[in-house]
Amino acid sequence: MKISDFTLPEIEYFRANCNFVNLEIEVFERRAKEITLEEIAEYLHISYDYARQISVKVNKKIIKVL
């Protein structure tokens, strides 16, 4: 799922209703700006695999509120 494909009102809805925590917020915001997981991992000083794991959690939360 590409978060950047959602409209701005949809992204705002996810921010308000998905209850993202800590790194999930960071990953969500950067994915909304089309930043790759590799770049996100580097920026947050975490491994790529951990960034991918957080991204999966973000996707699951988005699917729950859809």
Model-predicted segments: where are they?
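Short, Lys/Arg-enriched N-terminal segment that forms or immediately precedes the first helix
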Residues: 2-17, 50
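Short helix-coil-helix linker/hinge
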Residues: 17-24
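A short pre-motif secondary-structure segment
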Residues: 27-28
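Short alpha-helical "recognition helix" segments of helix-turn-helix
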Residues: 39-44
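C-terminal flanking helix
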Residues: 59-66
